[in-house]
């Protein structure tokens, strides 16, 4: 279902839901059975797998890959520019990958150029500055290893 108040510019499967006030740019790739909640922006160079939930208020910038069965909590902040400036002719797009089954808690900030491993969990409000290995729980500002899950 595509809510009539969303700006859907990409082709997505019928099994995926996009709620009101979302903007999805034309080259974004979104898989089956996803749920994109209200007030989300998904740019062009974005790949989203199957069975992904993206809660309200998330912007998924160019260079972000989200694999299958990932949960992205409300108001998660992705980044794709290590040294942001209003105008930077030397800008380099940094890629971020969220691997299968990972869960990103509400209000997290993920700095660019990192990988969140398979089935990893990031606690709400954490700031992730480096790669998180598969099957680990990380929490805090900056996020640190808590335990294996």
Task: Indicate where each model-derived feature is located.
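Flexible, glycine/small-residue-enriched loop-and-beta-strand segment within the central core
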Residues: 1-7, 12, 18-115, 141-142, ...
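Short hydrophobic beta-strand segments in globular cytosolic domains
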Residues: 105, 111, 123, 128-129
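Conserved G/P- and acidic residue-centered "switch" motifs that form tight phosphate/ATP-binding loops
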Residues: 122, 140
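C-terminal intrinsically disordered extensions
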Residues: 129-130, 144
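Extracellular disulfide-bonded cysteine-rich modules/repeats
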Residues: 135-137
